[in-house]
């Protein structure tokens, strides 16, 4: 028998594995509880609803795909950073087929605002990272950006 999963991070890890093996349709409270060898109530200790569970799993997938590289040279210039982003998108596509196109469909209609909020936070985090790389890239001329053509507009 599998060891019972007891932490939120372990539940998210099992959820990601369910998506890899069975696709998005496999994600519901009962299936995740069964895969974790815990009761449905144990899942509700961490997640208030299916939408909350799905949202947290989606967020953890984004985190896995785009977690900051241990190779700091990736973030020293924009070309290396963009190449890394594409490598990570390829990784995400292989690990989670259809994720980029389908994840937003997983949110229950009434709870869509929470999903959009999570996605907006993730997107802002990524944009801030790109902005920082642009601002510190030694290959970018100091006069490349001005008040009209800002790093943000780029």
Model-derived regions: residue spans:
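Short, hydrophobic secondary-structure boundary micro-motifs
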Residues: 28, 66, 98-103, 142-144
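Amphipathic alpha-helical packing segments from all-alpha helical-bundle domains
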Residues: 94-98, 111-140, 149-152
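Helix-turn-helix
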Residues: 10, 14, 18-52, 56
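Short, basic, alpha-helical segments at the C-terminal edge of helix-turn-helix-like DNA-binding modules
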Residues: 59-66
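N-terminal intrinsically disordered/low-complexity leader segments
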Residues: 1-6, 143-145
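Short helix-capping/turn signature of helix-turn-helix
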Residues: 47, 102-111
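Recognition helices and adjacent regulatory flanks at domain boundaries
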Residues: 4-5, 16, 30-32, 60, ...
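Hydrophobic alpha-helical connector segments
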Residues: 56, 70-95, 147-154
